[in-house]
Structures are given as structure tokens and as C-alpha cells.
A protein has these predicted regions:
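N-lobe entry segment of adenylate-forming
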Residues: 1-38, 42-57, 61
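Conserved pre-ATP/AMP-binding loop-to-beta segment of ANL
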Residues: 10, 25-26, 151-170, 177
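Surface-exposed loop/turn positions
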Residues: 28, 63, 87, 163-164
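Conserved AMP-binding/adenylate-forming
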Residues: 36, 51-99
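Conserved AMP-binding A3 loop
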Residues: 37-41, 166-189
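Structural core segment of the AMP-binding/adenylate-forming
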Residues: 56-57, 84-159
Length: 189
């Protein structure tokens, strides 16, 4: 019997977490930066709530959502919450310099920029430089949020997971400007 493995994969990356919960929602899904163990149920509930928070802040399907931070529960939840909305997560390191962050923001034209300032002095400095203000997010606490970019044009949304972009990652180096790499849900699932 032949199995088409591609069609058996989750259609969106946030559904990977849902798949993990099928073996037991109370099982550990991950351990955060404070050493707190998150169950699949808690993670799923938080992702759903933060997706609602993003929508309340004006994030639409096809928008780019830039996240400036360190590896943290906030960054993980923001990425999966963007997936729930069919928005593109643009994950960037807070350790990049101001010119690199500005170049990435200028290139990807995000609807909003989110800064995981609570665990990163660098993310907080970047947020302060851009005039971002703290907002409370369900389950992950305060995240600094940049202004709504009303002129941001959303990308087309595709049902096909091979065509729908999940994450836009920028490469950086010592020469040249950062370059964006679009990874689809199929690339990541």
C-alpha cells in the first residue's frame, strides 16, 4: 500500500501542535525560557488567544508580522498565531544591529512589528528606538508592539500549503543587504 506522505502532513504549521496534542493534550509540548513546562493544551489555547489578539491589533490574512526577539515562548506563540491567521511570520534576532533590522523591515513591509522585550535587552532597545508600546497578550504577557502600518498590502493567501508562505527568514552576512527566504507551510511541516 502506497501512502502519500505530503497529503498526510498538516496544512499549516500551527496544526503541528494540534497533531502533537492528539496523543494527549496534557503531555508536555515544550519548556519555556523560565523552565516552565507547557502542555499541548496550554500551548494551543495560548496560540488561539494570541491569534485573536493579533487580529484585534489589525493583523489580516496575508500580512507580514515581524517578530524581533530571542528564542522564547513569546516568539514561538507569535509565529504559530500568525499561522492561524494565514499571516507571514518574519522572525528576526534582536541581536541584529539597528541598520539590519531597519533594512529587513523596509524590505518585508510588515503590518506590525512585535518585540519580545521582557527577555531581551536588545529587543527592548529596538522597541524603544521605534516607539513601540507594551500590549498585554493572553498567556504570554507584555510584548511591545510597533505602530500599525496602514499602507501594508497583504499578500495573496493560498489554500495549498506548498504555496502559502508561513515564515520569511532573512539571511545576514558581512557583505550585502539581508535577503529574505520565503518558507511555505509545506517546507516546514
Amino acid at each position: 500500500m502506497e501512502v502519500d506522505y505530503l497529503t498526510s502532513l498538516p496544512r499549516r504549521i500551527h496544526l503541528i501542535v494540534d497533531e502533537g496534542a492528539k496523543a494527549g493534550a496534557s503531555r508536555p509540548a515544550l519548556t519555556d525560557e523560565r523552565g516552565i513546562v507547557w502542555s499541548y493544551r496550554r500551548l494551543i489555547d495560548t496560540i488561539e488567544a494570541v491569534a485573536g489578539d493579533l487580529a484585534r491589533l489589525g493583523i489580516r490574512p496575508g500580512d507580514r508580522v515581524m517578530v524581533v526577539g530571542e528564542n522564547s515562548i513569546g516568539a514561538i506563540v507569535l509565529m504559530y498565531a500568525a499561522s492561524r491567521l494565514d499571516a507571514w511570520a518574519v522572525m528576526t534576532s534582536a541581536r541584529l544591529g539597528p541598520h539590519e533590522l531597519d533594512a529587513i523591515e523596509s524590505d518585508c513591509k510588515p503590518r506590525r512589528v512585535f518585540y519580545t522585550h521582557g527577555i531581551s535587552a536588545e529587543a527592548d532597545a529596538a522597541a524603544c528606538r521605534r516607539g513601540a508600546e507594551a500590549e498585554s497578550f493572553t498567556g504570554i504577557g507584555a510584548i511591545k508592539v510597533g505602530k500599525l502600518e496602514a499602507s501594508a498590502v497583504p499578500e495573496e493567501v493560498y489554500e495549498d500549503p506548498a504555496r502559502q508562505v508561513a515564515v520569511l527568514i532573512y539571511t545576514t552576512g558581512t557583505t550585502g543587504r539581508p535577503k529574505g527566504v520565503m518558507l511555505s507551510h509545506r517546507n516546514l511541516a
